[in-house]
Amino acid sequence: SILNLCIISVDRYWAISRPFCYERKMTQRVALVMVGLAWTLSILISFIPVQLHWHRDKVGSRDGLDPPSNLANGTPWEEAGESDRSAENCDSSLNRTYAISSSLISFYIPVAIMIVTYTRIYRIAQVQIRRISSLERAAEHAQSCRSREACAPDSGLRASIKKETKVLKTLSVI
């Protein structure tokens, strides 16, 4: 589910942003709590409300909670042939509060968290690539100066851009 993907993104962010603290704090118990939280939220937002018919809009519904006695034109349900609830009829009237809270909790908030965490991971990766590239260029420059060649300006900018592009492609696939 998206909630599990959200937990994975948060876990990856913690592992990348604080690698030394991650080893101590991310125990098996914490991982189980995070996965349990995702499943609990999924059950609370979908299974229980559907089983208890909380997800249906009470106005004009035929779910047994608040059944209207007549149709809009005054015809009773039985006369209109609606009493048997055949599989051909699809009642899509949702309770507005349920629809909004369900979509927020099970989709929009997790997706927003995933976008934020993967954006931060990308920025951390960019900073690391720049640091590594500058160290590599400094080492190459020092080597070229030691061998008494002309100390040429760095040509590692292209390599740095290639590495950043590779990181962007990798994160976009994830």
Swiss-Prot record:
Q: Which Gene3D superfamilies match?
A: Rhodopsin 7-helix transmembrane proteins
Cellular component aspect of the GO annotation: plasma membrane; synapse
Family annotation (Pfam families): 7tm_1
Q: What is its main location?
A: membrane
> What keywords is this UniProt entry annotated with?
Cell membrane, G-protein coupled receptor, Glycoprotein, Membrane, Receptor, Transducer, Transmembrane, Transmembrane helix
The subcellular location is: Cell membrane
Example of a GO biological process term: adenylate cyclase-activating adrenergic receptor signaling pathway
Q: Where, by residue number, does the polypeptide cross the bilayer? A: 1-10, 33-54, 97-119, 170-174
Residue ranges that the UniProt entry lists as topological domain Extracellular: 55-96
Q: Which residues are glycosylated?
A: 95
Q: Which PROSITE patterns match?
A: G_PROTEIN_RECEP_F1_2
Q: Give the residue ranges for region: Disordered.
A: 64-88
| One of the record's GO molecular function terms | G protein-coupled receptor activity
By its UniProt entry, which InterPro entries does this protein fall under?
A: GPCR_Rhodpsn (IPR000276), GPCR_Rhodpsn_7TM (IPR017452)
Residues assigned to the Cytoplasmic compartment are 11-32, 120-169
What membrane topology is given? Multi-pass membrane protein
Q: What does the similarity note say?
A: Belongs to the G-protein coupled receptor 1 family.
Give the protein's function: Dopamine receptor whose activity is mediated by G proteins which activate adenylyl cyclase.
Name recorded for this polypeptide:
D(1B) dopamine receptor
Native species? Bos taurus (Bovine)
Q: What is the phylogenetic placement of the source species in the record?
A: Eukaryota, Metazoa, Chordata, Craniata, Vertebrata
